[in-house]
């Protein structure tokens, strides 16, 4: 009986931890217009956090290329593009990586943190975190 209770506790704890993870699908919101723009899948690879665009919600730009993106991302389709690369966990935040703005092709330092289990704070900045912009993404079930 004691083992059963321990097992149930472990399963409950694992489910709780998963619901508190940044990993999953998120709806991105344009901070200027308030409109939903895309669905991004945040995933873990080799202990780092990455994110790729898995759906573009505006049919007019769904198959656009990232013409201004640097390096290997130049002229790649935005759909399927990795836009967050190499974030590391630092307490309650993920940082020390980059976020790509496919609209202008610029790379910014990036920090992610959960505001709640279904609301992700995404901060892109240059130099210090004070100089940048914040978006909130919402979990897609």
Where in the sequence are the language-model features?
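Bacterial Sec-dependent N-terminal signal peptides
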Residues: 1-21
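Short, surface-exposed coil-to-beta transition loops
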Residues: 35-39, 105-109, 123, 131-134
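Central antiparallel beta-sheet cores of small beta-barrel/beta-sandwich binding domains
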Residues: 35-100, 107-108
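Generic beta-strand structural signal
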Residues: 44, 89, 114-115, 139
């Amino acid at each position: 009986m004691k083992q059963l209770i321990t097992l149930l506790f472990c399963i409950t704890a694992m489910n709780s931890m998963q619901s508190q993870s940044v990993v999953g699908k998120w709806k991105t919101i344009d901070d200027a217009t308030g409109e939903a723009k895309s669905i991004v899948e945040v995933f873990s690879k080799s202990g780092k956090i990455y994110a790729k665009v898995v759906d573009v919600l505006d049919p007019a730009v769904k198959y656009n290329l990232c013409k201004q993106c640097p390096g290997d991302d130049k002229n790649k389709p935005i759909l399927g593009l990795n836009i967050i690369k190499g974030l590391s966990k630092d307490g309650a935040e993920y940082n020390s990586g980059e976020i790509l703005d496919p609209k202008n092709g610029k790379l910014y330092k990036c920090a992610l943190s959960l505001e709640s289990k279904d609301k992700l704070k995404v901060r892109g900045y240059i130099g210090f975190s004070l100089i940048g912009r914040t978006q909130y993404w919402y979990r897609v079930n």
